[in-house]
């Protein structure tokens, strides 16, 4: 059906280098002719194509006319919020910080109209929790998310949840995904669903959402088919490539009230997206924390968006009205304009494609008797009337925008035009046009050293390892969450070229003498720790979740303790006079000095580790044939292990897991790594709060510092 519709439209439109009557295949963004003499004919074909398509589809705009959906047409700025972002959730204060987050969004970007609560990926897959579990396991559970939604709603911000259709390999719910989505929407008062990796939602999703909450919109990540515009009020315009003369977003052209959010997640210069949104009366997605990789906006991009949003929100009715004229003639080279009209009010949006500031007469338009003219970006009155025409003068910074308004001298409701112009003028005068976008600095948490044990003091159950200098190789799967900063190695700007592929680097490592546990800490050992100390975590959610009423299950005494977070592990280690091993200490203890791939050699061999066939954890000493050169057990499979490798940049906290586990989520490359792993393999694990960080598949072992002389 989609292909046939594309063929139909192809016969109606012309492209950049075509004659006025030659057909080209329509694309999500319809390219405009570079020759301005073809613009009139191009617009006529656009208009004809729209009318014919509406007729062929028997298009009905019922959902766009319903009051509960009216908000979507003016949802210009959507923020993609990583819920583990420390600006969004304060782990020290143990609370969501919605007010602070929105205030920062207001000052930097001009404020958000909606926020996507991104929850599971890239964490999902380390254990069997599914995407709905991740919402349930957020701080405060679903009740906490409902309170968060209330706080956002009080500030006029809409709330989206995320749907990951590829999540089919984790724990299954007793209900279909459609029912689960409706449950989550109802439970937290969500206003929309972001359809990750999808062109469109299932046909029954719309009716199910309408039954639980009015006005819940659907937004697709991938290009939305035109036949689904009727029941999808929003869609992404992702990686769209514009023509030199600004083109038209087809879905926005087809349905003027359809909101599209421009997004190029790995770009630091968002000029192209901003200009596309501006010329199409469309929106932007703000996304700096990309799954744990920082991709910050430049001051110039922020300044343009702040100026845009004030105008778009004030004149939202114009940008969703029928009278839109793409590409009206502009007077300066490299500048382009669109015209929006409603009720006699005219608004022109302009962009400067060039590297130079343009000044002087930007537009010459017909004069309407009695109208005044205003520069909405500079925030001042303008316009020089000459006979039946008016010259609109101003300036546009390099790659900047402009807007002119023609209206009669009647004030609209709300903030007066005078106040609005003053605010726009202040923003324009303070605009920072620099294009650099330095990000927050990543810092490695210092290791809290133990006392230096002498050789005869090495605690039972540990093995002493001499200090060593070596060149160590590290492998990791190139995921969108990135990895940590490696000195001397340029981090990839985006992983799309080799996404999901294993990459590696080597570095010089110097290890001082240390001892490391021969086995992971067991349930029985953790019981003793609790008995001796009375340890109780500040947040008890999921703490030792595999125990029954706080009691260790019989038969698991010698299994690795799991459902402990990094702090739970550190607390045990401190009590034992130890600490967690660093990533490098763990790896050296696993592979020894010859750099072997697995603790037992260079090839994986079934039967030497818990590879999942047991269906859960196994006793820590069950695989004697899988010991490392230093005699350490379980350094491959069974459970991932915490290491003392916590890093953070003020936005994202994470640590490195080693060893792999018995569990591996199957069915999608988007899942986190699982199953037994090589000694040199490291996995980046985003941290948020204990209820999520405690997993059925993560345990730990301890290390201790040894005296350098190794003496008695």
Task: Go through each PLM region and give its residues.
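An acidic-aromatic substrate-binding cleft motif
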Residues: 37-43, 49-53, 57-93, 119-122, ...
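Active-site-proximal substrate-binding groove within the catalytic cores of carbohydrate-active enzymes
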Residues: 43, 213-361, 367
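Aromatic- and carboxylate-enriched substrate-binding clefts and catalytic-loop regions
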Residues: 125-272, 278, 297
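C-terminal beta-strand-rich structural cap/linker in extracellular carbohydrate-active enzymes
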Residues: 388-425
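Catalytic domains of carbohydrate-active enzymes, especially glycoside hydrolases
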Residues: 100-120, 187-190
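Functional-site microenvironments in short loops/helix caps that host divalent-cation chemistry
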Residues: 465, 536, 541-687, 691-696
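Short, structured beta-strand segments at or near domain termini in extracellular proteins/domains
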Residues: 694-710
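A short glycine-rich, aromatic-capped structural motif
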Residues: 454-544, 564-567, 637
């Amino acid at each position: 059906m989609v292909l046939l519709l594309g063929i139909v439209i192809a016969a109606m439109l012309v492209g950049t280098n075509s004659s006025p009557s030659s057909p080209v295949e329509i694309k999500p963004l319809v390219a405009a002719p570079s020759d301005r003499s073809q613009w009139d004919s191009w617009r006529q074909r656009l208009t004809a194509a729209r009318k014919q398509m509406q007729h062929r589809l028997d298009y009905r705009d019922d959902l766009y006319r319903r009051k509960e959906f009216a908000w979507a047409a003016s949802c210009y700025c959507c923020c993609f919020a990583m819920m583990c972002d420390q600006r969004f959730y304060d782990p020290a204060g143990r609370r969501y910080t919605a007010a602070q987050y929105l205030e920062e969004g207001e000052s930097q970007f001009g404020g958000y109209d909606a926020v996507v609560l991104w929850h599971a990926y890239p964490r999902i897959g380390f254990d069997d929790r599914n995407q709905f579990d991740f919402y349930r396991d957020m701080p405060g559970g679903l009740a906490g998310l409902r309170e968060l939604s209330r706080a956002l709603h009080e500030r006029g911000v809409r709330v989206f949840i995320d749907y990951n259709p590829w999540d089919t390999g984790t724990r299954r719910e007793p209900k279909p995904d459609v029912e689960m989505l409706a449950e989550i929407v109802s439970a937290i008062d969500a206003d929309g669903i972001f359809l990750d990796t999808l062109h469109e939602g299932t046909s029954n999703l719309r009716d199910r959402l309408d039954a639980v909450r009015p006005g819940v919109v659907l937004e697709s990540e991938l290009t939305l088919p035109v036949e689904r515009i009727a029941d999808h009020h929003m869609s992404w315009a992702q990686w769209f490539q514009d023509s030199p003369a600004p083109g038209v977003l087809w879905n926005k052209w087809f349905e003027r009230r359809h909101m599209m959010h421009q997004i190029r997640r790995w770009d630091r210069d968002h000029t192209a997206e901003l200009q596309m949104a501006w010329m199409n009366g469309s929106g932007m997605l703000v996304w700096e924390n990309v799954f744990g990789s920082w991709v910050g906006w430049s001051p110039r991009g922020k300044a343009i968006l702040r100026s845009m949003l004030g105008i778009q929100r004030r004149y939202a009715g114009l940008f969703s009205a029928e009278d839109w004229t793409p590409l009206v003639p502009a007077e300066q080279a490299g500048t382009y304009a669109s015209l929006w009209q409603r009720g006699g009010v005219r608004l022109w949006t302009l962009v400067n494609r060039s590297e130079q500031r343009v000044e002087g007469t930007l537009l010459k338009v017909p004069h309407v008797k009695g109208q005044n003219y205003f520069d909405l970006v500079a925030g001042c009155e303008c316009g020089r009337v000459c006979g039946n025409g008016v010259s609109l003068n101003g300036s546009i910074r390099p790659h900047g925008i402009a807007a002119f308004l023609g209206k009669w001298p009647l004030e609209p409701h709300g903030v007066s035009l005078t106040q609005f112009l003053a605010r726009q003028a202040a923003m324009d005068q303070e605009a920072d046009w620099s294009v650099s976008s330095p990000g927050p600095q990543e810092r490695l948490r210092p290791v809290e050293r133990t006392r230096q044990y002498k050789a005869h003091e090495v605690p039972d159950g540990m093995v002493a390892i001499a200090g060593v200098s070596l060149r160590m190789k590290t492998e990791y799967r190139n995921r969108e969450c990135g990895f940590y900063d490696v000195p001397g190695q340029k981090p990839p700007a985006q992983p799309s070229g080799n996404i999901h592929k294993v990459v590696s680097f080597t570095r010089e490592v110097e290890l001082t003498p240390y001892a490391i546990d021969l086995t992971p800490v067991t349930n029985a050992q953790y019981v003793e720790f609790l008995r001796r100390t009375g340890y109780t975590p500040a947040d008890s959610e999921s703490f030792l979740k595999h125990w029954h009423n706080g009691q260790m299950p019989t038969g698991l005494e010698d299994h690795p303790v799991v459902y402990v977070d990094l702090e739970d592990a550190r607390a045990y280690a401190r009590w034992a006079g130890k600490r967690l091993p660093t990533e490098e200490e763990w790896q050296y203890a696993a592979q020894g000095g010859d750099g072997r791939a697995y603790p037992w050699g260079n090839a994986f061999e079934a039967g030497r580790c818990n590879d999942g066939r047991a269906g859960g954890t196994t006793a820590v000493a069950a695989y004697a044939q899988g010991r490392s050169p230093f005699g350490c057990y379980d350094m491959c499979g069974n459970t991932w292990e915490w290491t003392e490798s916590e890093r953070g940049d003020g936005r994202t906290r994470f640590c490195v897991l080693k060893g792999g586990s018995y569990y591996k989520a199957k069915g999608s490359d988007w899942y986190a790594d699982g199953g037994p792993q090589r000694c040199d393999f490291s996995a980046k694990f985003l941290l948020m709060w204990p209820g999520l960080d405690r997993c059925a598949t993560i345990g730990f072992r301890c290390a201790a510092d040894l005296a350098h002389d190794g003496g008695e």
